[in-house]
UniProtKB/Swiss-Prot annotation:
The gene is gpmA. Homodimer. The record marks 158 as: Transition state stabilizer. This is 2,3-bisphosphoglycerate-dependent phosphoglycerate mutase. The active site is at residues 10, 88. It catalyses: (2R)-2-phosphoglycerate = (2R)-3-phosphoglycerate.
Amino acid sequence: MERLLVLARHGQSEWNLKKLFTGWRDPELTELGIDEARRAGRWLKSQGTQFDVAFTSNLRRAQNTCALILEEMGQAGLETIRNEALNERDYGDLSGLNKDDARERWGDAQVHEWRRSYDVPPPGGESLKDTAARVLPYYIQTILPRVMSGERVLVAAHGNSLRALVMVLDGMTTKTIASLEIATGIPLVYRLKADTTVESKTVLDKDIDQDN
């Protein structure tokens, strides 16, 4: 039985390009972000991948990435379930601020702690621990059972909601997760064992040009 789980962070958004804290704000994808999503779909198709169901967040950048991936794979219209449990972490008072401006206001060390620590939230926002507290129950109760039943599952979401999942899948600690970056538009392909642990993991090489 194939137990396939593919995680994909959305393509570059307009606020990624401007280096703004985004969180639950809802900017569109850039042209590069659209290209990243399409490229991910082409790569997955080239690997012979097909999906039975897709999950995404309530935010457009993830929803559009999901749709573009599926379109490139010839699976437009696939069952796609949206849920705010998969939303990006809420950056609270940092939302909409330029990251360099935030460093000038609060200092490099404080902003780094808010961005990379496991359990220190920015003012009015969520820590990675808080994000995991909504992502992981949704994964365990809703997504994982479908993977374990043999369905091939795509999850198109966000850097921090996916970091929470990767932390569990890869057995990372609250310290090692601090250094993990999930690139935009790069699929993480997991195959799971019968006990729900990881059998294999494949990551698209971001330097591969799928048009050549």
